[in-house]
């Protein structure tokens, strides 16, 4: 094959298109892999009592910190286990929505209870929030004690779609 002006022009155009495509993919892939976490600041739930964020958004995931049964004004819910679970799940719902997700897009949930005997009662309230079809991966972890004498704490990971 002899190199003519037409062949060289075609070769140059193909090479340029390939390089531009590769560069565009590189930029897109690089930006996806190097996005920084975004720390949530919100007033829809009580302000954290420690050095942490209520949730952190990274790429298409929302990581929700452990939620205790505080009302938005910072007062405690010292009611029954069922009342505490409702306050916690209401707060989870608010945080997820603020971060661009919702209960239906949860990937995993970790529930801490102060006694494994609380599991059936906690599960009944939990099911009211999630229904029959929404079943994110979940662990229920019995712990010795939680801050302020609370009976339940929940942390979760949600997908942002």
Question: Which positions does each model-derived feature cover?
Answer:
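N-terminal presequence-like segments and the immediate start of the first folded domain
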Residues: 2-90, 94-107, 113-161
């Amino acid at each position: 094959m002899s190199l003519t002006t037409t062949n060289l022009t075609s070769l140059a155009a193909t090479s340029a298109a390939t390089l531009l495509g590769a560069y565009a993919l590189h930029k897109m892939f690089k930006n996806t892999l190097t996005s920084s976490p975004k720390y949530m600041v919100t007033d829809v739930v009580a302000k954290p009592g420690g050095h942490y964020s209520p949730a952190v958004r990274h790429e298409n995931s929302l990581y929700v910190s452990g939620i205790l049964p505080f009302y938005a004004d910072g007062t405690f819910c010292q009611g029954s286990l069922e009342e505490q679970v409702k306050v916690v799940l209401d707060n989870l719902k608010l945080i997820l929505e603020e971060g661009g997700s919702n209960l239906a897009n949860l990937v995993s949930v970790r529930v801490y209870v102060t006694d494994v005997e609380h599991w059936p009662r906690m599960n009944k309230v939990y099911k009211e929030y999630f229904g029959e079809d929404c079943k994110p991966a979940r662990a229920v972890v019995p712990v010795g004690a939680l801050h302020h004498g609370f009976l339940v704490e929940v942390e979760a990971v949600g997908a942002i779609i």
